[in-house]
Regions:
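Short, solvent-exposed loop/turn segments at secondary-structure junctions
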Residues: 16, 56, 92, 128-129, ...
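A short, acidic, flexible beta-alpha connecting loop/helix-capping segment that sits on the rim
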Residues: 200-211
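Histidine-centered catalytic micro-motifs
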Residues: 9-17, 53, 124-126, 163-165
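Acidic/histidine-rich catalytic cores of soluble enzymes
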Residues: 74-177
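Short, well-ordered coil/turn segments that N-cap beta-strands
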Residues: 3-9, 43-47, 80-84, 116-120, ...
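Terminal, non-globular segments
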Residues: 1-9, 16-17, 24-27, 79, ...
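Active-site acidic/histidine proton-transfer and metal-coordination neighborhood
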Residues: 20-121
Length: 224
């Protein structure tokens, strides 16, 4: 990180992670894979590791949430490293787990009981939130979202923002990133996010304009 003049380093787990898969191999290997990523992250000094939670396609919602909670508990059992695990909110496609703050609250509350003294954080993806029906574009809608967060996971649990515009309309339940200002959210949504969340923002957009996305995000933060 010193070589590249980076203050912080973040790692994303593989996208095939699924704590609620009906495939025993996929479900049972997920905790081991994420734990290994955590340990590697700790070795290189990564601040956070974020993971998707998967989908409960062949189980009820309650069963999927319980399996996810058990899996995350297995990841953290005995873990003493400094790198913190973050759960990423999903876009709500199909039967994906963690597309609402209520579901994330359920998972966090049960993890807090299983692994006393370790705090799991949350990674917000702006495109995922918008696709799940959270209107971060509208100021009044955004205020309501902040109140929901306060009553569920808590603002203090939000550790990182994936700053992506969305090609999908509000509530469209698909994960399609767009460049900042080019999608359905617009720059105003990122002004809303930056006005509340002072954590790092990461652009997950295509290489053709990612530098422009970063410039826009920096301008937004500098002009608040």
């Amino acid at each position: 990180m010193k070589k590249w003049n980076q203050e912080n380093c973040y790692i994303h787990t593989p996208y095939y992670i699924n704590f609620a898969s009906s495939n025993d191999l996929v479900r049972m290997s997920a905790p081991k894979i994420v734990r290994e990523e955590l340990e590697r992250g700790n070795l290189i000094g990564a601040k956070y590791i974020m993971t998707h939670l998967g989908s409960s396609k062949d189980f009820t919602r309650e069963e999927g949430l319980k399996m996810t909670t058990v899996g995350i508990g297995q990841i953290l059992k005995g873990y003493k490293g400094a790198t913190q695990l973050l759960l990423e909110i999903s876009a709500g496609a199909g039967n994906t787990i963690g597309s609402t703050f209520e579901e994330l609250k359920y998972i966090l509350n049960h993890i807090d009981i299983l692994i006393y003294g370790y705090e799991v954080g949350i990674c917000l993806d702006s495109a995922h939130m918008f696709a799940s029906g959270y209107d971060i574009k509208n100021k009044d809608g955004f205020k309501k979202i902040i109140e929901i967060i306060k009553k569920t996971v808590g603002l203090e649990r939000i550790k990182l923002i994936h700053a992506n515009d969305s090609k999908i309309e509000l509530g469209g339940r698909k994960d399609r990133h767009d460049h900042i200002g080019d999608g359905k959210i617009g720059q105003g949504g990122f002004v809303n996010l930056a006005s509340v969340f002072k954590c790092d923002f990461i652009a997950e957009t295509k290489d053709d304009k990612v530098e422009e996305d970063i410039r826009i995000l920096k301008d937004i933060r500098n002009n608040l």
